[in-house]
């Protein structure tokens, strides 16, 4: 056993040393790239094409890591028998070795390195024209970004993969998997699974003469709504072009007038009704030591509500009750719905299949409540 442990230790040290050597060999000096083009100081939305239908921005990854790692629950989780057993098994050893190799390549602790690498933000985008995905990482330290590029390529070479590179307009594109390409553009790092999307982003980076997501009408309106909302503790902001997806026939079941599931109607009925008309949806993820909150918003008009308007209750009471604050709360849901009328008039809301299932449940519940009608007598008490 001791010999095996020593052997593994030697192998790990060898692996790290080899990784560092390969990283140093691969990484290009920062000044080997041409000077950044004029006016290159931009944001990700000014580089992405206008055909982007979904994007999410992580503005402060360093802050997220700090909040999670210093969370009051961390000590409790680490004291749990499951966690203690996992650590004793040696399973996290490879992860720890990888972190040490990453720190050695970056020349600083991993948290500090990730914070610096992403201090300009991370943007993930989906393109409508070809389904391509692009990830843009913006850093204030181009030298550290080049070190990271070298680290990724070194990992690929250690796995036995042959180095594959190609040049486009003076930038080197590296294959980091069978479908994923990586390009460093000065203080930007681009990852994409679609060559044409990558070329469009590089063209815009150099030329700045095409329509972009920043000029997309739906995105401009969504960005204004996000800017007007409370940005406190926001760690992720997102945009989804519902109209483009709806017109393209994507996820047709989501945009149907009626759904199969009553529980889904209770929780999402009003949202789904709105999705059939709204041009876009925005999302915000907020993180504090008290918890995680997801907020979704979309443009709305009163004439979109029929036939569901009645089932939300009286208009002057159209606000969901405040969530109950109880110790150790893991999940809570508050919704503003007239459950009794929803149940009684389910034919207006659910498909035939959903109504058949509801009829079976109604019979069973009426029997359980000694013959009292569940929709009228029981749910009516909640109105």
Predicted regions and their residues:
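Structural boundary/hinge residues at secondary-structure and domain interfaces
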Residues: 33-175, 217-289, 293-383
